[in-house]
Every structure is written in structure tokens, then in C-alpha cells.
């Protein structure tokens, strides 16, 4: 199975981070992580990317519909447009379910953004590939 290594950028929010495969603490201490068993850029399906709310995804709290997200890998550049965002419970993993007819990107971080300790919820951003 191939893995994701690249960069995610959300220019309006001044987010620019390396993306590595996996979401273990060691990976997330250094980079955003591609959530295992989710799609890869360019594939039909749902790509999951997670990062800490107090570091790389700190500015995600200011996301808006239509914000542009770019994922750059060795295979090319993929551009997405934010279509929605919401707060869910950690057990609501259905946000990562495959999207059989679309190329989607789901960003995941802990919520609330200014919470001390283990955050009780997750902030989810959903985007559709535009090119």
C-alpha cells in the first residue's frame, strides 16, 4: 500500500505543514498525519489528515467555506475547496467514511482549540477536490 508524504497548505489561514503517514504521537509531534486506511490524493474517496490543534492546525479555528486547501505530493498538486466544518464526538468516526463518488479531504483536530488537556471533541473540516 502506498503512503502519503507531502505538504498541506491553507494560504488564507497561513497553514503550511508537512504531511507524513500515520497519526501516532511521534508523527503528530512533527507533522500532520495521513490517517491510515483513508484515500490518497487523486483517488476517489475520502483523504483523512490530522494535526494538533495547538500547533500545526492552530489557525483552523478561523476556517471558512470556500477556503482553498492544497495538498502537494510527489505525484502532483491537488486543490480542494472547503464545503463544511463541524464539531463531533471522538467516537463519530463516520466523518472518515469513504466517499464513493467524490474526491474529498477531511481535516481532523481536537476541540475546543483552547482546551487544556485531552480535548473532549473533534473539529472536522470537509473539502472537495476542485482540480
Predicted segment positions?
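Solvent-exposed, non-transmembrane regions of membrane-associated and secreted proteins
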Residues: 1-131
Amino acid at each position: 500500500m502506498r503512503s502519503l508524504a507531502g505538504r498541506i497548505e491553507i494560504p488564507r489561514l497561513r497553514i503550511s505543514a508537512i504531511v507524513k503517514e500515520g497519526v501516532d504521537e511521534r508523527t503528530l509531534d512533527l507533522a500532520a498525519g495521513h490517517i491510515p486506511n483513508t484515500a490518497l490524493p487523486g483517488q476517489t474517496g475520502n483523504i483523512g489528515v490530522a494535526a494538533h490543534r495547538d500547533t500545526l492546525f492552530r489557525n483552523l479555528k478561523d476556517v471558512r467555506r470556500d477556503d482553498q486547501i492544497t495538498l502537494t505530493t510527489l505525484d502532483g498538486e491537488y486543490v480542494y475547496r472547503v464545503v463544511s466544518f463541524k464539531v463531533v464526538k471522538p467516537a463519530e468516526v463516520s466523518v472518515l467514511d469513504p466517499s464513493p463518488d467524490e474526491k474529498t479531504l477531511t481535516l481532523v483536530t481536537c476541540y475546543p482549540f483552547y482546551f487544556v488537556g485531552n480535548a473532549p471533541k473533534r473539529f472536522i473540516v470537509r473539502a472537495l477536490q476542485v482540480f
